[in-house]
Amino acid sequence: MIICEIGLNHLGDEEYALEYVSKILSTDVDAITFQIRESDFYVDTYDSFILSDNFYRNIVEKIKNSNVLIGIALSDIKKIPFFDSLNIDFFKILNNV
């Protein structure tokens, strides 16, 4: 299984993130994982790295329509219900220490 994990390479730019995912989907990847970091990780620059909930709704649909698994890597388990409502295939819990 090949999993492509998308960390901060999008720098909060949703158009770039969409383009990035589209290029990944043109390969033989089996799954894509997005890392979700919390505000205390970024200190003052956090807001510039956030992708919107609407972006995640749309990108999950795009990935699932491509028959690729979608995962979310996060340390704030309070965010799981939102992503679970999008029918995420798997979760990866990050260490928040």
PLM segments and residue spans:
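Hydrophobic faces of well-ordered beta-strands that scaffold small-molecule active sites
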Residues: 2-6, 30-34, 70-73, 89-93
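Conserved, mostly hydrophobic/aromatic
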Residues: 5, 24, 83
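Glycine-rich anion/phosphate-binding loops
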Residues: 9-23
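Catalytic domains of carbohydrate-active enzymes, especially glycoside hydrolases
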Residues: 19-37, 86-87
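Generic structural signal for well-ordered alpha-helices
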Residues: 21-25, 53-60, 80
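Glycine-rich, proline-tolerant flexible connector loops at the mouths of alpha/beta enzymes
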Residues: 30-54
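Catalytic beta/alpha-barrel core
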Residues: 48-51, 68-80, 89-97
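A generic structural signal for well-ordered alpha-helical segments
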Residues: 62-67
